[in-house]
Swiss-Prot record:
Originating organism: Mus musculus (Mouse)
Family: Belongs to the G-protein coupled receptor 1 family.
Keyword annotations of the record: Cell membrane, Disulfide bond, G-protein coupled receptor, Glycoprotein, Membrane, Olfaction, Receptor, Sensory transduction, Transducer, Transmembrane, Transmembrane helix
InterPro entries, per the entry: GPCR_Rhodpsn, GPCR_Rhodpsn_7TM, Olfact_rcpt
Residues annotated as glycosylated: N5, N165, N265
One Gene Ontology term, aspect cellular component: membrane
Protein name per the record: Olfactory receptor 5P54
Cited function: Potential odorant receptor.
Residue spans, topological domain Cytoplasmic: 47-54, 121-133, 218-237, 293-310
Disulfide-linked positions: C97-C189
Subcellular localization: Cell membrane
UniProt-listed SUPFAM superfamilies: Family A G protein-coupled receptor-like
Length: 310
């Protein structure tokens, strides 16, 4: 990082979710439980998709990668947060902090693109079922996956590049539970009038574009569903859309508040709560929302259990 005329910063101290020792143990138990549920649930989804031939379809390929992203994302944030709760304050080298910021933004942005890709898959399946094998070929699927990760990488590099161009002065304490851009910005002695808004513009663009893509696809899906004469077909389509839209609303709602809304609109504590929700809780909810309400996944799980015990 550019140190300017100030003392060069070599490490940062992350204060964690709370500075009250009374709550540290309770928070540790809660977040450890949430992390274990996230880990076991998403690993189970990945394993089930791999071993069940009936789930070897594009939608479950995207779900497989969504689970993979959630595992890495929640692991990176949760492990550091649990260490903070045990030690009440965690010292991280600047390079490690920059790497954490880059990786969390990378996977968070990739998740936005994956959700948009899943919306496209649902659109093709409902609106153009006869062309599904052509429009969702292996080549198209891997292209969508590649674009998701490349888009995430670009946003991660933008955040990290802005961070590395800031100058800092002590005390080097981050009032947060991971190396997020907004708390780091408060430590800077640089002019942040431009650098401070670049990440918001970048993240805001990703959110707006992917939300518009999802909205267009689901308007088309809704119009197609309303034209259906089969009650069972309508019910199945609405059920699929309902679980997806629930996950989308939760995810996009929180990241919009954190990365797009003006920082003066909410307090540090509210920022912490929102960040905990989308970095720790949402990865746990995703596999529950997508899987437990999905008939194909439940059937595949039932068959897998039967194979194990017979």
């Amino acid at each position: 990082m550019n140190g300017g005329n100030h003392t060069s910063m070599t490490e940062l101290f992350i204060l964690g979710p709370t500075e009250d020792p009374t709550f540290c143990i309770a928070f540790f138990v809660i977040f450890l439980g949430v992390y274990m549920v996230t880990l076991v649930g998403n690993i189970s989804i990945i394993t089930l998709i791999r071993i069940s031939s009936q789930l070897h379809t594009p939608v479950y390929l995207f779900l497989n990668h969504l689970a993979f992203v959630d595992i890495l994302y929640s692991t990176l944030v949760s492990v550091i947060m649990l260490m903070e709760l045990l030690e009440h304050e965690l010292a991280l080298p600047v390079a490690a902090c920059a790497a954490e910021l880059c990786i969390t933004v990378l996977f968070g942005s990739s998740e936005c693109f994956l959700l948009a890709a899943m919306a496209y898959d649902c659109y093709v399946a409902i609106c153009s079922p006869l062309l599904y094998s052509t429009l969702m070929s292996s080549r198209v699927c891997f292209l969508l996956l590649g674009m998701s990760y490349v888009g995430g990488c670009m946003n991660g590099w933008i955040f990290t590049g802005c961070l590395l161009n800031l100058s800092f002065y002590g005390p080097y304490q981050i009032d947060h539970f991971f190396c997020d851009f907004s708390p780091l910005l408060k430590l800077s002695c640089s002019d942040v009038s431009i650098i401070g808004i670049i990440p918001s513009i970048s993240s805001g663009s990703i959110i707006v574009v992917t939300v518009l893509v999802i909205a267009v696809f689901y308007i088309c899906i809704l119009m197609t569903i309303l034209k259906m004469h089969s009650t069972d077909g309508c019910h199945k389509a609405f059920s699929t859309c309902n679980s997806y839209l629930t996950a989308v609303t939760l995810y996009y709602g929180t990241i919009t508040f954190i990365y797009v809304m003006p920082k003066s609109n909410y307090s540090t504590e509210k920022n912490k709560v929102l960040s905990e929700f989308y970095t720790v809780v949402i990865p746990m909810l995703n596999h529950l929302i997508y899987s437990l309400k999905n008939r194909d996944v439940k059937d595949a799980l039932r068959k897998a259990i039967v194979r194990v015990y017979t």
